[in-house]
Design a protein with these regions (language model features):
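Structured, amphipathic secondary-structure segments that form assembly/contact surfaces
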Residues: 1-4, 8, 18, 22-140
Length: 140
């Protein structure tokens, strides 16, 4: 297996889940794409956020969420990873930076058009998601 694709798959699922503009069609599109790359643990996270009104809140407040990968720790023998990143949440009056750490494992699956590298993220979970900095935006 070529391990050079692994960080891209891990980054891609995080991009789909955590880069969210206030656009319901785009959010549905990215979540649909994400579900091809993650097992039921990803669907459970999505459903929990949806039930809590997370996506409706993004639309209602015109918040823009962006994710930035700091690093990925990967163990080739177990195919386990830990993702370290930051999320930027821009709202009308402030910008919030959050620290995000997730973990999971990659499992080989048949390649498909929707999963061209044939890697499924399993047992995906959020280990840390905390505020690290908040800035008030200047109104001119």
């Amino acid at each position: 297996m070529k391990y050079k694709y692994l960080p891209n798959n891990i980054k891609k699922i995080h991009h789909y889940f955590f880069t969210l503009p206030p656009d319901d069609k785009y959010i549905r599109y990215t979540m649909e794409k994400a579900m091809y790359l993650v097992d039921e643990t990803g669907l459970a996270q999505y459903n929990t956020l949806k039930e809590r009104g997370f996506y409706s809140n993004i639309l209602g407040t015109s918040a823009v969420f962006s994710i930035f990968c700091d690093s990925i720790r990967f163990d080739k023998s177990t195919m386990e990873f830990t993702y370290y990143g930051r999320q930027r949440i821009e709202r009308r009056s402030n910008i919030l930076m959050r620290e995000l750490v997730t973990a999971g494992q990659l499992r080989r699956v048949p390649r498909t058009e929707n999963n061209p590298h044939g890697l499924l993220i399993v047992n995906w979970r959020t280990l840390l998601n905390k505020d690290i900095e908040q800035k008030t935006k200047s109104n001119y």
